[in-house]
Amino acid sequence: EIYPKQFEKLSQLSEQYSIGSAHFSTRENIQLHWVVLEDVSEIFRSLAEVGLTSREACGNSVRNVMCSPLSGVCSDEKFDSTPYALATAKFFLRNPMAQSLPRKFKFNFTCCEKHGMVRMVDVGLIPEIQQIDGSEQKGFKIFLGGGLGNRSFVGHQLEDFTPEEDLLYTSIA
């Protein structure tokens, strides 16, 4: 999530400390280029004032948790996965268990089978609903091990259905 006041602050910081433009990465991170080292602490303070951080933008950590922009509006989705993506991001942000991983680690939630990059990231999640004991149960189809590096891999399906109450435990594992 990003809000207008945060965009305004990023624009101001780009004009004041960078080259007047910002770059949006493929992981939905925003980069300011040509920043002078002496200005970095002030930039960090200014970002924090509007609820932004530079944490987990690089290094061997859980990176920005992505969610399809069609989540919540896609006619083929079983349910909106946005709250689950936000909760996952909140859990892993600044969490010590996610700070010194062997490599960067990427999550991607999508809305349905047709959209998103769930087979091209470390953990890809598609919302699913199953009938269990006569009632509808929300959960996710999970794919693991995808990547787009110099040796690309297509993720493999972990299981057909992980109930929503097990999602955090499965994500930690």
Task: Describe the function of each predicted region.
Residues 148-173:
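Internal alpha/beta scaffold segment
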Residues 133, 146-148:
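Residue-level recognition of phosphate/Mg2+-coordinating polar/acidic sites
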Residues 140-143:
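Conserved histidines in hydrophobic membrane contexts and catalytic metal-binding motifs
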Residues 1-137:
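Small-residue-enriched alpha-helical segments and adjacent helix-cap loops
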